[in-house]
A protein has these predicted regions:
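Conserved alpha/beta core of the MobA/IspD/sugar-nucleotide pyrophosphorylase nucleotidyltransferase superfamily
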Residues: 1-4, 81, 91, 96, ...
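Residue-level signal for inorganic ion chemistry
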Residues: 10, 35, 90, 104-105, ...
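Conserved donor sugar-nucleotide recognition element shared by glycan-biosynthetic enzymes
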Residues: 11, 59, 83-87
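Acidic donor-binding segment of Leloir-type glycosyltransferases
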Residues: 46-75
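Short, high-confidence coil segments that cap the C-terminus of an alpha-helix
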Residues: 48, 98, 125-128
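Short phosphate-binding loop-to-helix
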Residues: 68-100
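Conserved core of the sugar-phosphate nucleotidyltransferase
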Residues: 110-165
Length: 166
């Protein structure tokens, strides 16, 4: 099965509200902003044809500068008022010949080339794919402040990014 062309949409448009105002996509990891490390992971993956980074308007210039040497970065653009809107805008900015889309969080820089490649190849075969890990915490279903049930942890997976689909 030939590998379809895959474009990555890196979502980096958050408000940093959960980080006490610290912008996690620009926070340094080993001296390099997380969003630059994230973009580099996709830049260095042969399964990725192009990258669109969706961010806040005030971060377009600094992120563009960080990605200046990355030839797969097609656009660094403003996102929307929600994650869903930002993803939609990013998807619409991909080239018309892109057949698969990988959605990834800009503040998740430690994604490996192997994970990206496996997700693209799985989506190429099955239509969609996302990495997942078994849930370690006990999860409760709560309604009206009361615990209704406890799902069997063995049946639960925590889904991560990149989420790839055709």
């Amino acid at each position: 099965l030939p590998l379809k062309r895959c474009g990555a949409v890196i979502v980096a448009a958050g408000s940093a509200s959960r980080m006490g105002g610290i912008d996690k996509v620009m926070a340094p990891l080993g001296g390099t902003p997380m969003v630059a490390r994230t973009a580099a992971a996709f830049q260095n993956c042969d399964a990725i044809a192009e990258i669109v980074i969706v961010t806040r308007p005030d971060l377009i210039r600094p992120i563009s500068a960080l990605c200046a040497g990355m030839d797969k970065v097609r656009a660094v653009m403003a996102g929307g008022s929600s994650r869903q809107e930002s993803v939609w805008l990013g998807l619409n900015a991909l080239s018309e010949d892109i057949q698969l889309a990988a959605i990834h969080d800009g503040a998740r820089p430690l994604v490996s080339n192997l994970v990206i490649d496996r997700m693209v190849r799985a989506a190429n075969s099955y239509g969609a794919a996302a990495p997942a890990v078994p849930v370690k915490d006990t999860i409760k279903v709560v309604k009206g402040g009361l615990v209704e049930k406890t799902p069997d942890r063995a049946t639960l997976q925590a889904v991560q990014t990149p989420q790839v689909f055709d």
